[in-house]
C-alpha cells in the first residue's frame, strides 16, 4: 500500500470498524462489502465484494469466521438480521433475526453477544441456542464491551437507569442463576457514552455523554480506581482503550486529540493530586493526559493499542500508527489510507 494519507475517496466511507481480540487484525464494513487488514505492517488480507453495505463486522479471534450485519444506504442484509460468515467457504452458515435493528455484536469462541436497540441476546455457538435475552434501555449506538482475553467472558452494557452500567460474567453461565455474577453501579450522573473492558476483564473504563471525565473501576466490586479529566468543555467520546499491560488508557474524542493517560502515574501521584486538587477547587480530579496525538480530521474513529503503539482508524478510512510514550511523545507516526 502506498504511504500517503488521503480522504479524497469519500464514496468509500467506512461504515464500521473493529479490532480482533489482540489487535493483530482489524475489520471494516463498507458500502460494497468488507475488508480485513493485518495491523502491522498494514496489509490487506481479505477483500469481499457483496453488492451491498456491511454496517457491522466482528472477527472471531484470528479465524475466517465473522459476524455480519447490513448497513449503509444499500444494506446487504436487513438491519434486524445477523449473519455468521465463513470466509473459507465465502458464504453464510447461520442467520439470526430479531424484532429490532442490530446495533452491535461481540463474538467469542463459545458465545455471541448481540446488541439490539432495546435488548441483548447471548447465543451459544455450539448449538446456536439463545442462552439469555436481556431487556435494556434504548441503546441506539450499541454501547457494550467484552473482555478480549479468549478465555474470559465478562460483558458490560448500560443499565436502565441513566448513568448506571451492568457487568456480568458469562464464563460459567447457568440458566437457573440468571442474576448471579452480575454487578450494577451508577458511574456517571449523565448518560453513558462509552464503556471499555481491559484485556482480562478486571478493569472497566467509562465516559458519559459530557465527555469531560473518564473513570476506571475494578470489575470485582466496581470500586473506583482512577479518575481522569479529558478537558473542561463537553466532548463526544468516540473510543476508549487500555493497553495490554494496563499501564495506559487512550481516549479519542471530537476535540481533535487522542489523549493518553498513565494508570501507573495516577497511582503513584494519587495522594499529591487529590490534595492539590482540593486546594484549587477541582474536587478529587486533576489527573491529565501524559501525552496526546493531534488528529487533523475531526471524524469518528476507533483506537486500539498494539504493543507499544497506538492505532487509529477513522470513518474516512485513514489509518494512523504511532509509537508512543517515548519521553511522553508520539514517535515514528505513520499515516495511510485503507483505500490505497
Residue ranges and their predicted role:
Residues 3-35, 51-64:
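Beta-strand-rich domains and repeat architectures in extracellular enzymes and scaffolds
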Residues 37-45, 81-91, 119-137, 158-192, ...:
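Per-blade loop-tip surfaces of WD-repeat and WD-like beta-propellers in eukaryotic adaptors/scaffolds
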Residues 13, 33, 48-55, 59-62, ...:
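Terminal intrinsically disordered, low-complexity extensions flanking WD-repeat/beta-propeller proteins
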Residues 22-50, 65, 69-88:
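Beta-propeller domains
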Residues 89-149:
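Asp-box/WD-like beta-propeller blade repeats and closely related beta-sheet repeat scaffolds
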Residues 9-18, 53-58, 100-106, 136-148, ...:
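Canonical WD40 repeat/beta-propeller blade segments in eukaryotic WD-repeat proteins
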Residues 22-23, 63, 109-111, 150-152, ...:
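Conserved loop/turn motif of beta-propeller repeat scaffolds
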Residues 26, 66, 112, 155, ...:
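Hydrophobic beta-strand positions that form the internal "hydrophobic ladder"
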Amino acid at each position: 500500500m502506498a504511504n500517503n494519507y488521503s480522504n479524497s475517496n469519500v464514496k468509500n466511507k467506512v461504515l464500521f470498524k473493529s479490532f480482533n481480540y489482540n489487535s493483530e487484525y482489524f475489520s471494516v464494513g463498507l458500502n460494497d462489502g468488507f475488508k480485513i487488514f493485518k495491523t502491522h505492517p498494514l496489509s490487506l488480507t481479505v477483500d469481499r465484494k457483496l453488492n451491498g453495505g456491511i454496517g457491522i463486522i466482528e472477527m472471531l479471534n484470528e479465524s475466517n469466521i465473522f459476524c455480519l450485519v447490513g448497513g449503509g444506504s444499500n444494506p446487504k442484509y436487513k438491519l434486524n438480521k445477523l449473519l455468521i460468515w465463513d470466509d473459507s467457504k465465502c458464504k453464510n452458515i447461520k442467520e439470526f433475526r430479531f424484532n429490532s435493528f442490530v446495533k452491535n455484536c461481540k463474538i467469542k469462541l463459545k458465545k455471541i453477544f448481540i446488541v439490539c436497540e432495546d435488548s441483548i441476546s447471548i447465543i451459544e455457538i455450539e448449538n446456536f441456542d439463545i442462552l439469555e435475552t436481556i431487556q435494556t434501555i434504548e441503546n441506539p449506538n450499541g454501547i457494550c464491551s467484552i473482555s478480549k482475553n479468549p478465555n474470559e467472558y465478562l460483558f458490560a452494557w448500560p443499565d436502565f437507569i441513566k448513568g448506571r452500567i451492568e457487568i456480568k460474567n458469562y464464563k460459567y453461565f447457568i440458566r437457573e442463576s440468571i442474576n448471579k455474577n452480575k454487578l450494577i453501579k451508577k458511574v456517571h450522573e449523565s448518560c453513558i457514552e462509552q464503556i471499555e473492558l481491559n484485556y482480562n476483564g478486571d478493569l472497566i473504563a467509562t465516559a458519559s455523554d459530557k465527555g469531560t471525565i473518564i473513570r476506571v473501576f475494578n470489575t470485582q466490586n466496581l470500586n473506583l480506581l482512577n479518575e481522569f479529566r479529558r478537558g473542561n468543555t463537553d466532548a463526544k467520546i468516540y473510543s476508549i482503550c487500555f493497553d495490554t499491560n494496563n499501564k495506559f488508557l487512550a481516549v479519542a474524542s471530537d476535540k481533535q486529540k487522542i489523549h493518553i493517560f498513565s494508570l501507573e502515574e495516577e497511582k503513584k501521584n494519587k495522594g499529591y493530586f487529590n490534595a492539590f486538587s482540593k486546594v484549587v477547587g477541582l474536587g478529587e480530579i486533576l489527573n491529565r493526559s501524559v501525552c496526546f496525538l493531534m488528529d487533523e480530521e475531526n471524524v469518528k474513529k476507533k483506537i486500539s493499542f498494539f504493543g507499544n503503539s497506538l492505532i487509529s482508524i477513522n470513518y474516512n478510512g485513514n489509518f494512523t500508527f504511532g509509537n508512543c510514550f517515548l519521553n511522553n511523545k508520539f514517535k515514528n507516526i505513520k499515516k495511510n489510507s485503507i483505500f490505497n
